[in-house]
């Protein structure tokens, strides 16, 4: 099995509309759906929800 099959690189985009993104990996076996995480958006200086971008 290749390295990127189970844990692909994904982008997390801010829902605040600032365009800020985080880049991370996710385990497809444990999280098959799009993930959402609350992270810090430095553009608006607040914690907001980031959603997986495809």
UniProtKB/Swiss-Prot annotation:
Matching PROSITE patterns: RIBOSOMAL_L33
Pfam families, per database record: Ribosomal_L33 (PF00471)
Cellular-component GO terms for this entry: cytosolic large ribosomal subunit
SUPFAM superfamilies xrefs: Zn-binding ribosomal proteins
Entry superkingdom: Bacteria
GO biological process, one term: translation
Any one GO MF annotation of this record: structural constituent of ribosome
Keywords for the protein's UniProt record, in alphabetical order: Ribonucleoprotein, Ribosomal protein
Family, similarity comment: Belongs to the bacterial ribosomal protein bL33 family.
Full protein name: Large ribosomal subunit protein bL33
Organism of derivation: Corynebacterium efficiens (strain DSM 44549 / YS-314 / AJ 12310 / JCM 11189 / NBRC 100395)
């Amino acid at each position: 099995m290749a390295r990127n099959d189970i844990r692909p690189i994904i982008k997390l985009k801010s829902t605040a509309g600032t365009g800020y993104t985080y880049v991370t990996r996710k385990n497809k076996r444990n999280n098959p759906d799009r993930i959402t995480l609350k992270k810090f958006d430095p553009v608006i200086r607040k914690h907001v929800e980031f959603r997986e971008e495809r």
